Curated annotation (Swiss-Prot):
Functional description taken from the UniProt entry: Promotes the exchange of GDP for GTP in EF-1-alpha/GDP, thus allowing the regeneration of EF-1-alpha/GTP that could then be used to form the ternary complex EF-1-alpha/GTP/AAtRNA.
Keywords assigned: Elongation factor, Protein biosynthesis
Cited InterPro entries: eEF-1beta-like_sf, EF1B_bsu/dsu_GNE, Transl_elong_EF1B/ribsomal_bS6, Transl_elong_EF1B_B_arc
Protein name: Elongation factor 1-beta
Gene name linked to the record: ef1b
Taxonomic source organism: Metallosphaera sedula (strain ATCC 51363 / DSM 5348 / JCM 9185 / NBRC 15509 / TH2)
Length: 91
């Protein structure tokens, strides 16, 4: 089965949200077959930053990327999360 790379932007509730803590909690909640490949921060506005994570996951996953968005959005300190990119990793 082929994997896909999902680029997920996680928006904090405020500038006091610890994005490193959010990333660690996300990693601990990832289902089997999912893997955090990369993480970075991206400025939004007025000193507020979003967490951008690159997650490898199975292509044929029930619910698609909705599960990943819901999982990230459920973390304390997270306002919401949205998929901003997806690409296939194999042929």
């Amino acid at each position: 089965m082929t994997d896909v790379m999902v680029v997920l932007k996680v928006f904090p509730e405020g500038d006091e949200t610890d994005l490193e803590k959010v990333a660690n909690e996300l990693v601990s909640k990832l289902p089997e077959g999912y893997k955090l490949v990369r993480k970075e921060t991206e400025p939004i506005a007025f000193g507020l930053k979003a967490l951008v994570v690159y997650v490898s996951m199975p292509e044929k996953t029930e619910g698609g990327t909705d599960t990943l968005e819901e999982l990230a959005s459920s973390i304390e300190g997270v306002s919401h999360a949205e998929v901003v990119g997806i690409t296939r990793l194999g042929f």
